[in-house]
């Protein structure tokens, strides 16, 4: 046929059988990738430390999506929440991966069958005997079926009526587990961080889809609308489908980057805004203050802070710190976290408590500045020692650790104090193992960042595709030069402009 690579899809333009075949093959590829990727991730995943080396630190991409839908156990005998499992059942991580691969194989065979047996009676218009598709009717069928799936997911899977529920956690990502969720029918259901909204919105959207599907199955479109929107043209279907996909991609890019109940931080890592707003730092200070109010010592209050909460309050877990083109997991960047050293409290020689100014997200380097409780600069690590007035040596800054591995340890050596002041810029201080993975010390993004970048990029690309194919189908007659309502037989090549008898070529 001699088609250029960018026009090869025209072979299925008027061939419903093979159009179906290539879509089944596409499903086979998607399901096959998902299953294969899951098996690869399971082969490299280390489940031994869910607190300091969770899935998102290891760069897992598909495991978090399985987990949020209720899969927590492995046939390897481990659970995502830690501990061992004796009877994981068929729906383990490996079970889901295997089912996708089996499904992919079946779709592959079905695609081959439909490619070979393309000329089926079901695709023929009995009035003309030519292949044709009743696109408005097919739209109704698909809308109805997707509505049933959506409704069923909300009613059965999410609520636990027939299914495991979904991953639910507290606002600080400490107590997450899979559990049934009751639908939230009040105004709280519109809060993106309320899990009940997931159930209620799937039920509502599914109901709407079922009703809309039945409507489109039972009511034919008016002729003017049918012609105006080119409802008989398969490229109209392509254009509107691309619109649905790019809209969904934009939505999920937003819910992933800004955070929501559908993207728990235990599975995908914290958001950048939680670092920017000092979200975890405030909660840690609140807990310490509550401990002090109960007459606990500073050491006891800090020792009660969960290591998991302290780990979230570390800039290396900020997805915006990794460059877009730095390959590898977070563990390949700053290393595998081994333990929390504790919270450093700095004091000057007058006994004032000093706080290290934290590094903003988009800085690679940042001056080390220590301020007091009123925000007044009291000490720093100067760039020019000759000009310094607030150096650690001049101010006499000392340091003591509370909680963590160095609980109760104090330092007065200026070199050591400055070392920990620099590290305190990055949040809570952790011991990191860079040797095991040969980590290079350069921050990486989490799967939250990759997902957002990928979906935002493809959404922009698909937006262009929607405009392109929408314009092609709406203005096909203009582009082709043929009036779509032209009854006369057009001889291709007879005219310089297709269908325009005033431009008949001269016979030489």
Curated annotation (Swiss-Prot):
Record's keyword annotation contains Ligase: no
Biological process, per Gene Ontology: photosynthetic electron transport in photosystem II
Main location: plastid
Details of cofactor binding: Binds multiple chlorophylls. PSII binds additional chlorophylls, carotenoids and specific lipids.
Annotated Gene Ontology cellular component terms: chloroplast thylakoid membrane; photosystem II
Protein name as annotated: Photosystem II CP47 reaction center protein
Membrane topology classification: Multi-pass membrane protein
Biological function: One of the components of the core complex of photosystem II (PSII). It binds chlorophyll and helps catalyze the primary light-induced photochemical processes of PSII. PSII is a light-driven water:plastoquinone oxidoreductase, using light energy to abstract electrons from H(2)O, generating O(2) and a proton gradient subsequently used for ATP formation.
Organism whose genome encodes this protein: Jasminum nudiflorum (Winter jasmine)
Location of this chain's protein in the cell: Plastid, Chloroplast thylakoid membrane
Gene: psbB
GO molecular function: chlorophyll binding; electron transporter, transferring electrons within the cyclic electron transport pathway of photosynthesis activity
UniProt similarity note: Belongs to the PsbB/PsbC family. PsbB subfamily.
Alphabetic keyword roster: Chlorophyll, Chloroplast, Chromophore, Membrane, Photosynthesis, Photosystem II, Plastid, Thylakoid, Transmembrane, Transmembrane helix
Positions of transmembrane segments: 21-36, 101-115, 140-156, 203-218, 237-252, 457-472
Pfam families tied to this protein: PSII
Subunit organization: PSII is composed of 1 copy each of membrane proteins PsbA, PsbB, PsbC, PsbD, PsbE, PsbF, PsbH, PsbI, PsbJ, PsbK, PsbL, PsbM, PsbT, PsbX, PsbY, PsbZ, Psb30/Ycf12, at least 3 peripheral proteins of the oxygen-evolving complex and a large number of cofactors. It forms dimeric complexes.
């Amino acid at each position: 046929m001699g088609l250029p690579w960018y026009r090869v899809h025209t072979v299925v333009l008027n061939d419903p059988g093979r159009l179906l075949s290539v879509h089944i093959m596409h499903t086979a590829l998607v399901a096959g990738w998902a299953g294969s990727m899951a098996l690869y991730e399971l082969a490299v995943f280390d489940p031994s430390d869910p607190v300091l080396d969770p899935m998102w630190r290891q760069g897992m991409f598909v495991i978090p999506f399985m987990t949020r839908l209720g899969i927590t156990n492995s046939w390897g005998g481990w659970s995502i929440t830690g501990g061992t499992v004796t009877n994981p059942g068929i729906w383990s991580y490996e079970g889901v991966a295997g089912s996708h691969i089996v499904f992919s194989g079946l779709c592959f065979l079905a695609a081959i069958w439909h490619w070979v047996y393309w000329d089926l009676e079901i695709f023929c218009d009995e009035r003309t005997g030519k292949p044709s598709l009743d696109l408005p009717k097919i739209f109704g069928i698909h809308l109805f079926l997707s509505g049933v799936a959506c409704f069923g997911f909300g009613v059965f899977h999410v609520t636990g009526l027939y299914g495991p529920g979904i991953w639910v956690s507290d606002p600080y990502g400490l107590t997450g587990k899979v559990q049934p969720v009751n639908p939230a029918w009040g105004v709280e259901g519109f809060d993106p961080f309320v899990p009940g909204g997931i159930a209620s919105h799937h039920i509502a959207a599914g109901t709407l889809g079922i009703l809309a599907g039945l409507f489109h199955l039972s009511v034919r479109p008016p002729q003017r609308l049918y012609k105006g929107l080119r409802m008989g043209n398969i490229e109209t279907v392509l254009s509107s489908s691309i619109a649905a996909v790019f809209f969904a991609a934009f939505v999920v890019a937003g819910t992933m980057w800004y955070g929501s109940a559908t993207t728990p931080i235990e599975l995908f890592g914290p958001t950048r805004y939680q670092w920017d707003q000092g979200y975890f730092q405030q909660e840690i200070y609140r807990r310490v203050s509550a401990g002090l109010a109960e007459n606990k010592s500073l050491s006891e209050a800090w020792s009660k802070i969960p290591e998991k909460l302290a780990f979230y309050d570390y800039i290396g877990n900020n997805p915006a710190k990794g460059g877009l083109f730095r390959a590898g997991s977070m563990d390949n960047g700053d290393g595998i976290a081994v333990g929390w050293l504790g919270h450093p409290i700095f004091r000057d020689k007058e006994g004032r408590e000093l706080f290290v100014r934290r590094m903003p997200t988009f800085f690679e380097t940042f001056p080390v500045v220590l301020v007091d409780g009123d925000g007044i600069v009291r000490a720093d690590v100067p760039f020019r020692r000759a000009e310094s007035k607030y150096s650690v040596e001049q101010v006499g800054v000392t340091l003591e650790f509370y909680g963590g591995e160095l609980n109760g340890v104090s330092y007065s050596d200026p070199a050591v104090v400055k070392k920990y002041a620099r590290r305190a810029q990055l949040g809570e201080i952790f011991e990191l193992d860079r040797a095991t993975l040969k980590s290079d010390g350069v921050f990486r993004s989490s799967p939250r960042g990759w997902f957002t970048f990928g979906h935002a990029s493809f959404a922009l690309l698909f937006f262009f595709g929607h405009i392109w194919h929408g314009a092609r189908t709406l203005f096909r007659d203009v582009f082709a030069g043929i009036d779509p309502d032209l009854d006369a037989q057009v001889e291709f090549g007879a005219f310089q402009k297709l269908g325009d008898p005033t431009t008949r070529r001269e016979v030489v």
